[in-house]
Amino acid sequence: MSPISIELIIQISIGLSASLILLFAFLPQTLLTIKTKNTAALTISMFIICFIARLCFSLSAILTIIVYIHNQNYGLSLYALTLPVLICHGINMLLNLIIAFIKINNVYKAKIHKMNENEYIIFAYAQKLKEKVSIKNK
């Protein structure tokens, strides 16, 4: 079993740092979108493209593991080093899917109500406020 080179450890560390930065960049937007359901200013194409990019990064990491294990026999140590990167990419893909789902749902509901997305979001927010007021008045 060959020892893992310092270059490979540095490469994986940089990849993990980039994954964590992306994770913390998307987390506030995802939490805000879940809380407010407001996706009017967001484009669905951005989240789909980001999802595909992260999927490609994940596949690249998996293929790297397979190649290194096959050719250089690093075994589980390489897998253990790249696992955090794969987990971060998986969480990032999940965050993208959550926002994309809320966006698609808002666009769909807006079309049902024959509104644009901005009008529907205002309408839905007004409905929530009415419900809160009626609950307080009871």
From Swiss-Prot:
Its annotated compartments are:
Cell membrane
Known Gene3D superfamilies for this protein?
Answer: 1.20.1280.290
Q: Which UniProt keywords apply?
A: Cell membrane, Membrane, Transmembrane, Transmembrane helix
Asked if the Swiss-Prot or TrEMBL record annotates the protein with the keyword Membrane, the reply is yes
Instruction: Give the family, as the similarity comment puts it.
Output: To U.parvum UU007, UU008 and UU041.
The domain of life for this entry's organism is Bacteria
* Transmembrane domains' residue ranges: 8-28, 47-67, 82-102
Where is it predominantly found? membrane
GO terms under cellular component: plasma membrane
* Annotated membrane topology: Multi-pass membrane protein
What is the protein's given name?
A: Uncharacterized protein UU042
